[in-house]
Design a protein with these regions (language model features):
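Short glycine-/small-residue-rich flexible loop motifs, especially phosphate/cofactor-binding loops
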Residues: 4, 60, 80, 178-179
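Conserved S/T- and glycine-rich ATP-binding loop of Class I adenylate-forming
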Residues: 6-9, 45, 50, 91, ...
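Conserved AMP-binding/adenylate-forming
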Residues: 91, 147-190
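Short polybasic/polar patches that bind polyanions
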Residues: 12, 32, 64, 157, ...
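Conserved AMP-binding A3 loop
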Residues: 1-27
């Protein structure tokens, strides 16, 4: 077993035991899913959580299993410039990171007017429909094609252009946030 120190977010600071069986089970499940996503591409992780964090501790084993190249962000403030350098295929973080990302994107989207606003609304609506495995009609397919080029591709490029998945762990991700990020072209797993 491994004992990880926690800061006591929900109480007093304490050591928490993670069993080797639990760690391996998490790693095997993650490896299977991530290998299917990255296929033959090299696994490139950009990480910023402290290495002592229980989620990051497990992620390190997954990185080894995948033979991944790992970049460590200099700081949260330098995350976007570090993304541009690393061009990650996988980014792992806790739900709070994705909540903050959602808020920033949502605020930016809400400032848009006219055609841009309509395009963003279509991107979210059609992306959600795709996520729910609902068929798009011919008109929706054409609109979705333009949403992919004009909105989703630009968003993906903000994260290095090679991102296959955000992986949220260490707590529950709000379903609404996961659906939103997926709908705008940022594949998000939990």
């Amino acid at each position: 077993a491994c004992i990880i120190y926690t800061s006591g977010t929900t109480g007093n600071p304490k050591g928490v035991m993670l069993s080797h069986g639990g760690i391996l089970s998490n790693c095997e499940g993650a490896q299977e899913i991530l290998k299917s996503l990255i296929k033959k591409d090299p696994a490139v992780f950009l990480t910023w959580l402290p290495l002592s964090h229980s989620y990051e501790h497990t992620v390190q084993y997954v990185q080894i299993l995948l033979g991944a190249k790992v970049f460590y962000a200099e700081s949260l403030e330098k995350l976007l410039p570090n993304v541009a350098i690393a061009k990650p295929t996988i980014m792992t973080a806790v739900p709070r990171f994705y909540q903050n990302l959602y808020s920033k994107i949502f605020i930016n989207f809400s400032k848009q007017k006219g055609f841009k606003k309509k395009l963003i609304e279509s991107t979210i609506m059609l992306g959600t429909k795709n996520l729910d495995k609902k068929k798009l009609n011919f008109k929706e397919k054409i609109i979705n094609f333009f949403c992919e080029i004009l909105v989703r591709r630009k968003i993906k490029n903000q994260f290095g252009g090679k991102l296959k998945a955000f992986v949220s762990g260490g707590g529950a991700l709000d379903q609404k946030i996961g659906e939103f990020l997926n709908s705008i072209g940022l594949p998000t797993l939990q």
